């Protein structure tokens, strides 16, 4: 069983995270919902826990199963992670060859000393002093470590009910650490990112178990998307309320203690949309959203690289023309440098062009990096000639 509607959600969330990180002095930048869209990273964690539980909760019964699971998950996330990391190196080399630059090459965020922690996916454990190289990749580190935790939990607990009880404890532990030690509310990354992911991932596990229990008890079931019924009307109302709650929450929870509730709200939203019974589900199941959802991991992983290219183009234009291309602006108590070279509507067009570029590049990396990378790791498993669990019906990052 797949969850195409949740795939649609994933694609939209990836786009909003990409828009959140793009600093241009247009209307989009100041929209409260956009400023809070970093919270969709927690949606990814919850969604991942949900679908990984669906696919593997009864299939990790031996160390061989666990090893195969982790190899498949590594094949899902690592090739594109490594490719985007490597892609930043030529940009730093260009900076090193430039006559003058605002910062020295291969320093701070791009220090060579942080390459190994990135390659080994441990840069969400507080090893580094800040975000490094491809900034969004901290969450890939955190999520892969959550996969390891999930596999170990399934192998050690054995019984499904014990896995779920332990998942609740792990989710609570993650929440406790983030609430107790993060100085940015839930917006922790390189320092306590793993614990943030634990909170969301195992909330997703619980959401799936509730979904499973609800269906098993016959209280609710997945409804045919094209057959309006009383049930679909109720589902439509539930979906509408859930969507409204997400919009209001994301717009108001940024930068405050309310953000700690993000995984809980997103767990409820994932549970509601997993039944796929309302009109919003029918919309998200349409081909454009499915196409975007399939490429959401690439959208998420390449957008920082595209931003770097846009900013370098602005710097080069500023040097050649002598006209300022940036402006400093205080947002949410911090000074940000925004691309600014025309009217506000022009910056809105620039933001849309940026999103188009991100999607275009993501289409290429999906075809030439993601799919071949997964195939290579699957081939590696096949050569081992050992029974392997099947991959998740929907893969989430």
Residue ranges of each PLM-predicted region?
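Functionally critical transmembrane alpha-helices in membrane proteins and complexes, commonly lining
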Residues: 2-59, 78-85, 113-123, 340, ...
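Transmembrane alpha-helical segments and their boundary/interface "anchor" motifs
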Residues: 39-41, 57-94, 105-117, 144-146, ...
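Membrane-interface helix-loop-helix regions
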Residues: 78-142, 175-182, 192, 199, ...
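Alpha-helical transmembrane segments of multi-pass integral membrane proteins
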Residues: 201, 236-370
């Amino acid at each position: 069983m797949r969850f195409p509607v949740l795939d649609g959600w994933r694609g939209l969330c990836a786009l909003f995270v990409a828009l959140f990180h793009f600093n241009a002095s247009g209307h989009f930048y100041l929209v409260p919902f956009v400023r809070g869209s970093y919270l969709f990273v927690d949606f990814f964690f919850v969604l991942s826990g949900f679908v990984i539980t669906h696919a593997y909760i009864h299939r990790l019964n031996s160390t061989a199963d666990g090893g195969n699971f982790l190899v498949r998950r590594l094949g899902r996330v690592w090739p594109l992670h490594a490719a985007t990391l490597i892609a930043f190196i030529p940009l730093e080399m260009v900076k090193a060859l430039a006559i003058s630059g605002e910062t020295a090459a291969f320093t701070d965020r791009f220090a060579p000393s942080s390459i190994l922690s990135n390659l080994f996916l441990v840069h969400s454990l507080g090893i580094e002093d800040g975000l490094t190289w491809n900034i969004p990749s901290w969450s890939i580190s955190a999520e892969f470590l959550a996969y390891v935790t999930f596999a170990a939990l399934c192998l050690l607990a054995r019984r499904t009910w014990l896995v779920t009880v332990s998942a609740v404890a792990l989710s609570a532990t993650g929440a406790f650490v983030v609430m107790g030690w993060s100085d940015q509310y839930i917006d922790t990354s390189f320092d306590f990112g793993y614990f943030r992911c634990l909170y969301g991932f195992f909330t997703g596990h619980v959401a799936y178990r509730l979904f499973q229990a609800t269906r098993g008890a016959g209280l609710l079931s997945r409804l045919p998307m094209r057959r309006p019924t009383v049930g679909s009307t109720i589902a439509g109302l539930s979906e509408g309320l859930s969507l409204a709650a997400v919009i209001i929450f994301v717009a108001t929870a940024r930068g405050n203690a309310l953000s700690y509730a993000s995984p809980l709200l997103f767990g409820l939203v994932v549970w509601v949309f997993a039944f796929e019974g309302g009109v919003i589900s029918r919309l998200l199941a349409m081909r454009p959203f499915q196409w975007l959802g399939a490429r959401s991991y690439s959208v998420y992983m390449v957008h920082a690289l595209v931003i770097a290219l846009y900013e370098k183009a602005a710097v080069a234009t500023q040097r050649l023309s002598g006209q300022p291309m940036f402006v400093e602006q205080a947002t949410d108590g911090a000074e940000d440098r925004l691309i600014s070279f025309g009217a506000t509507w022009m910056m809105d067009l620039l933001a849309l062009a940026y999103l188009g570029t991100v999607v275009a590049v993501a289409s290429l990396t999906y075809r030439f990096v993601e799919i071949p990378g997964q195939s290579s790791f699957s081939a590696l498993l096949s050569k081992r000639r050992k029974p392997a669990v099947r991959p998740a019906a929907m893969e989430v990052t």
